[in-house]
Amino acid sequence: MCILLHMEKKRFADGVLTTLCYVEKEGKWLMLHRNKKKEDINKGKWIGVGGHFEAGESPEDCLYREVFEETGLHVLSHQLRGIVSFFYGEKDCSYMFLFTAVLEEGPLKECSEGELQYFSYEEVKALPLWEGDRIFLELLTKGEGFFSLTLRYDREGKLLEAILDGKENLLSS
């Protein structure tokens, strides 16, 4: 049994587990402008709320904790919409559980990671986003069912490949 547990720990040894949530309210998405941390891979970009798993957390546990930490509000309902696999260069990777959610009513707290603001779906398209985020946001707004998306970036942040459900490269269509 000890050998099996050791093997299980190594399966994601080269990858990071995260959640990302797009909060919906009155036809708008809650976006976080990552502009407060010096060392931030997302610096200057607008993204949803979320973050890294802590030890022992399920995707939902991570979702609830991260959303509350960043907004000060609790999740009322949520839906797991997809899993996104990110590959950067040859070795670095992360796996993201992508959610949409509705939050309790109340004022948003000040976030230590950046500025929170609601935008219409059309306004979001004009924001500085990662190219891969544009792809999965489009899938979310179209109401696609559950999906798997693989995004490959080079070291400079250029999107090289976007594979939907293991089949279709969205960059070549």
Task: List the model feature ranges, each with a label.
Residues 140-162:
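Short, active-site-adjacent segments that bind or coordinate small-molecule cofactors and metal centers
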Residues 53-76, 86-140, 161-173:
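Unchanged
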Residues 9, 81-88:
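Short, solvent-exposed loop/turn elements at beta->coil junctions and helix N-caps
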Residues 43-49, 58:
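Short, surface-exposed acidic-centric catalytic microdomains
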Residues 3-4:
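Short, positively charged and aromatic/hydrophobic N-terminal segments
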